[in-house]
């Protein structure tokens, strides 16, 4: 689950991590009032959406007086920002962060991620702050420094100091930088975050180390024990179909293609998307119905896929282990009848009760194309859609 920058900064502030003073605003008048209350000679007007690249898209402006705050707030609020992370549709700005300006001396990148290779949390840092870390990793990987954190003891002071020296934090500010990193790590662990990025971390003219931006992603599986984090969820920033999917315990991610996919198991779902691409098709979604799908769940999955008007065909690819193929066949038949399916449907079944499942599909009298293998199914649905 993602949260907004201003929410992330409030969490950091509660842990004693330095961030600029700021206030959230939902209207132009609120933005002006916030700037007035902050009383800074320079204010920063920042669009709040769940995506990076806001500055390049015109979503971050520096205002030197209240009139400029009003002008920029009017310009940004209601605007659709298109960045490299929003996709071509972009995201509409519905709230702003009004923040005190600061005298920036240097910019850095600090991030915490879960590293699958080491099964540990890794602290990453670079003196190339303010730019996309992916670009730094690709062009100058030697400028990224990492510390693998032992979960038994947590981030150690010597590790944070080593990072600070490696990215050339001024010696007189190393103590502040270490305190910052230790606080950030504590937030990461306490709140079950999966990503925490500060880009940029800055040093200022008056000798401070603070977060100028904050991005957090939290493990959705742990939200049951973090009611405070769950309250920060902004449903308007999420895909409506993904919200609906979560209500029915379906794992759904919308994509840009025209072939709907319904699969059981994340690995098989990814392989299904890959093989559709291999045969020159474009998957419209990732949809994992899980191991215990019922006929009702399959019906909801169909409705979800068909809610995407770009879908021109559906490929059902099921391996019946825990879930029997005849149960899936029953669900597919019921769903096809209920939604009045009018687009091509290809079904590939394998596993427990596969012959019974295939027999049920064949005798249903519905326009369902059977596939003998995953490759056969992918070829058939691509051919039918094209």
Swiss-Prot record:
EC number: 6.2.1.5
GO BP terms in the entry: succinyl-CoA metabolic process; tricarboxylic acid cycle
Domain of life, source organism: Bacteria
UniProt keywords, alphabetically: ATP-binding, Ligase, Magnesium, Metal-binding, Nucleotide-binding, Tricarboxylic acid cycle
Pfam families xref list: ATP-grasp_2, Ligase_CoA
Cofactor note as given: Binds 1 Mg(2+) ion per subunit.
Residues involved in Mg(2+) binding: 199, 213
GO cellular component, one term: succinate-CoA ligase complex
EC top class, as a word: ligase
InterPro entries assigned: ATP-grasp, ATP-grasp_succ-CoA_synth-type, ATP_grasp_subdomain_1, SUCC_ACL_C, Succ_CoA_ligase-like_bsu, Succinyl-CoA_synth-like
Gene3D superfamilies attached to this UniProt entry: ATP-grasp fold, A domain, ATP-grasp fold, B domain, Succinyl-CoA synthetase domains
Positions that bind ATP: 46, 53-55, 99, 102, 107
Keyword ATP-binding among UniProt keywords: yes
Family assignment from sequence similarity: Belongs to the succinate/malate CoA ligase beta subunit family.
Quaternary structure annotation from Swiss-Prot or TrEMBL: Heterotetramer of two alpha and two beta subunits.
Stated role: Succinyl-CoA synthetase functions in the citric acid cycle (TCA), coupling the hydrolysis of succinyl-CoA to the synthesis of either ATP or GTP and thus represents the only step of substrate-level phosphorylation in the TCA. The beta subunit provides nucleotide specificity of the enzyme and binds the substrate succinate, while the binding sites for coenzyme A and phosphate are found in the alpha subunit.
Protein name: Succinate--CoA ligase [ADP-forming] subunit beta
Species this protein is from: Shouchella clausii (strain KSM-K16) (Alkalihalobacillus clausii)
Source species taxonomy: Bacteria, Bacillati, Bacillota, Bacilli, Bacillales
């Amino acid at each position: 689950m993602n949260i907004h920058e201003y929410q992330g900064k409030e969490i950091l502030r509660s842990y004693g991590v330095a961030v600029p003073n700021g206030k959230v605003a939902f209207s132009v008048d609120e933005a002006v009032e916030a700037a007035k209350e902050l009383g800074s000679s320079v204010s920063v007007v920042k669009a709040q959406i769940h995506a990076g690249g806001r500055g390049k898209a015109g979503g971050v402006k520096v205002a030197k007086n209240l009139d400029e705050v009003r002008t920029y707030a009017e310009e940004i609020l209601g605007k659709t920002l298109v960045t490299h992370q929003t996709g071509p549709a972009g995201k509409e700005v519905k709230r702003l962060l009004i923040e005190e300006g600061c005298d920036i001396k240097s910019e850095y990148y600090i991030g915490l991620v879960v590293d699958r290779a080491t099964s540990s949390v890794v602290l990453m840092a670079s003196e190339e702050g303010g730019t996309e870390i992916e670009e730094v990793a690709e062009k100058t990987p030697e400028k990224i420094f990492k510390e693998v954190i032992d979960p038994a003891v947590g981030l150690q002071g010597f590790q944070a100091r080593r990072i600070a020296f490696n990215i050339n934090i001024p010696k007189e500010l190393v103590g502040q930088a270490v305190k910052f990193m230790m606080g950030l790590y504590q937030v990461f662990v306490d709140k079950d975050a999966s990503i925490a990025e500060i880009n940029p971390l800055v040093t200022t003219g008056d000798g401070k180390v603070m977060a100028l931006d904050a991005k957090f992603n939290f493990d959705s599986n742990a939200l049951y024990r973090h009611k405070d984090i769950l309250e920060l969820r902004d449903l308007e920033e999420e895909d409506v179909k993904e919200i609906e999917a979560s209500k029915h315990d379906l794992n759904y991610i919308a994509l840009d293609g025209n072939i709907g996919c319904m699969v059981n198991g994340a690995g098989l779902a990814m392989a299904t998307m890959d093989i559709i691409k291999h045969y020159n098709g474009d998957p419209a979604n990732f949809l994992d119905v899980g191991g215990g799908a019922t006929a009702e769940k399959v019906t909801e999955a169909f409705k979800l896929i068909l809610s995407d008007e770009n879908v021109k065909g559906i490929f059902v690819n099921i391996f019946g282990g825990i879930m029997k193929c005849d149960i899936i066949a029953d669900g597919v038949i019921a769903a096809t009848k209920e939604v009045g399916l009018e687009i091509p449907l290809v079904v590939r079944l394998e596993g427990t009760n596969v012959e019974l499942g295939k027999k049920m599909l064949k005798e249903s009298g519905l326009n369902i194309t059977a596939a003998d293998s995953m490759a056969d199914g992918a070829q058939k649905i691509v051919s039918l859609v094209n």
